[in-house]
Amino acid sequence: MKHDWWLSAARPLDQTACALAAERQRRLTKPRGSLGRLERLAIHLAALQGRERPVVERPWIAIFAGDHGVAEEGVSPYPQAVTGQMLRNFATGGAAISVLARQLGAELELIDLGTAEPLEPPPAGVRRRHLGPGTANFLRGPAMSVRQGLDALAAGRDSVRRAQAAGAHLYIGGEMGIANTSSASALASALLEQPAAALVGPGTGLDAAGLARKVAVVERALALHGAHAGEPLEILRRLGGFEIAALAGAYLACAQEGLPALVDGFICSVAALLAVRLNPACRDWLLFAHRGAEPGHRRVLEALAAEPLLDLGLRLGEGSGAALAVPLLQSACRLHGEMATFAEAAVADAGR
């Protein structure tokens, strides 16, 4: 395996398909530009997929799970046992993302990268790639070893390759891990060079005292590791989580393999920011599903010059916001591909 595989070139966008799609939009039976962003989405997807009429009928959803050592600092109201329990809930169909995946007819891949209290035997349908019983507490040292960080990145890459081999049209990454908003907030604060208080939110429902404690924990982590903020791979190792690293690896691999990625909420967007810092060329392959309720999400999206599709006040994670946005992409593609042209419908075109 190439040690720095994430630096490999991203697949270039197909400018011929882009031009053909743009010309098709001009010929459809509607005032030009009247479908707003849906038109631009269809044209961009055409460039990504290399075809005049893109399709998003086979989405692939991968959920990466991993626990965080910083949970012992009381930054989440939930115990770490919940991570493994939710993996079982995903597998048995009871979680929000399970419902949405069924609705979409999407493949739902579940990957346990390292839970503090893993379920034995692993629930049917859960792929186990054990990197450790969660990360270390980043107030005491780096969250991950070098080996763990590289293996987590590779786990995301390998998921994308499975999706590509299965003929997926779109890749969605999701996450599960108690205390992972603390990790994401610390990473965002370091990468954006912004204060923790501006980025840290309540996560899964902290009260005011819990939020203050979480801010203080992130500030201590930045004091310990912040000198490495300009080194994205090292700051990921020091402040990140297995699932965040896997998501970053997945987004990098999507660009290299030529598979469009739809980025979910705050944690996934932080992983996307890391991916772009590691290899800026991957940015073209990232679509952003929604703007969530976590205060740091808006700032991360701004740093990525991202224009999210939805704004519903979501803060669940699991890839749920991205799954909710898939029908919008499908509609953009169907309108683009199935509407009649002025010539086909024998309708006069005002521009001709």
From Swiss-Prot:
Its EC number is 2.4.2.21. Pathway: Nucleoside biosynthesis; alpha-ribazole biosynthesis; alpha-ribazole from 5,6-dimethylbenzimidazole: step 1/2. It catalyses: 5,6-dimethylbenzimidazole + nicotinate beta-D-ribonucleotide = alpha-ribazole 5'-phosphate + nicotinate + H(+). InterPro entries: Nict_dMeBzImd_PRibTrfase (IPR003200), Nict_dMeBzImd_PRibTrfase_bact (IPR017846), Nict_dMeBzImd_PRibTrfase_N (IPR023195), Nict_dMeBzImd_PRibTrfase_sf (IPR036087). One of its GO terms (biological process) is cobalamin biosynthetic process. Keywords: Cobalamin biosynthesis, Glycosyltransferase, Transferase. HAMAP family: CobT (MF_00230). PANTHER family: NICOTINATE-NUCLEOTIDE--DIMETHYLBENZIMIDAZOLE PHOSPHORIBOSYLTRANSFERASE (PTHR43463:SF1). Catalyzes the synthesis of alpha-ribazole-5'-phosphate from nicotinate mononucleotide (NAMN) and 5,6-dimethylbenzimidazole (DMB). This is Nicotinate-nucleotide--dimethylbenzimidazole phosphoribosyltransferase.
